[in-house]
Regions:
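Short, conserved beta-strand element in jelly-roll/cupin
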Residues: 17-32
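Histidine-centered metal-chelating micro-motifs
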Residues: 12, 38, 47-48, 52-57
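Short alpha-helix capping/helix-loop boundary micro-motifs
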Residues: 33-37
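Conserved short histidine dyad/triad with adjacent acidic residue
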Residues: 1-17, 51-53, 74-75
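Ligand-binding loop in jelly-roll beta-barrel domains
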Residues: 44, 52-75
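Short beta-strand segments
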Residues: 3, 38-40
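Short hydrophobic/aromatic-rich beta-strand segments that constitute the beta-sheet cores
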Residues: 14, 32, 66-68
Length: 75
């Protein structure tokens, strides 16, 4: 799956399950904190991958717009 996603500031719980998600931020700022880990800040122009099994907090600091690609490996 691919798409464009946008969100206003706020906090949500993120649970990836068995899916990889590639993200490229077109605008905005997010802070992603894995459970038991340290927060990482991503800004417009940054790209990152959320791996299967990720559990943590996604905080939209500034309204964010991203393109994404999700891939679920075969069982």
């Amino acid at each position: 799956h691919t798409g464009v996603w946008e969100a206003t500031p706020g906090v949500t719980r993120s649970i990836k399950g068995d899916t990889f998600e590639f993200c490229h931020l077109l605008s905005g700022v997010v802070e992603i904190t894995p459970d038991g880990g340290s927060p990482v800040i991503y800004k417009a122009g940054d790209s990152f991958v959320m791996k299967p099994g990720f559990v943590g907090v996604w905080k939209t600091v500034e309204t964010v717009r991203k393109i994404y690609v999700t891939v679920t490996p075969p069982a």
